[in-house]
Amino acid sequence: MLEYSTITNKGDRSVNEDSIAVIPSGKSGFACILCDGLGGHGMGDVASGCVCDTFRNMLLGTTEMSGFLPVALRCAQANLMREQIRLNATTKMKTTAVALAVDDKKAYVAHIGDSRLYIFRKNKVMTRTLDHSVPQMLALCREIREDEIRNHPERSSVLLSLIHI
């Protein structure tokens, strides 16, 4: 049986632009997604909710996790674009996403933007997804150190997001 909890924090924003979905699949599988609407663009909460809803609806009845995440994110992108047009918000409604799908044999990860997935072993971070952000690219080019990403002046400059592909 899968046990989980979720929590988000809107920080100093007036609206919480985070959305989370956790969906059991089959006997031992599950998938989860966290979306963080891009602040400053407007309607980030709508964007993150739209992507989570698409993900949730696609997973219902799915038992095959292999290949699920890329298809789900492409469908979420298409739904988000339709929603932008419907709401006349084509320059708004952007979100990051990080998703995990697990079956009885493997774990699959997909992400876009600066929402991260960490893998821990014995209470230590073994690895994490790499951000699609300006400071992450600077760190990869060795222009700044990895520990400087968090406080970098452009830490909120996301290079990729859903709609920004």
Predicted regions, residues:
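PP2C/PPM-type serine/threonine phosphatase catalytic domain
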Residues: M1-I163
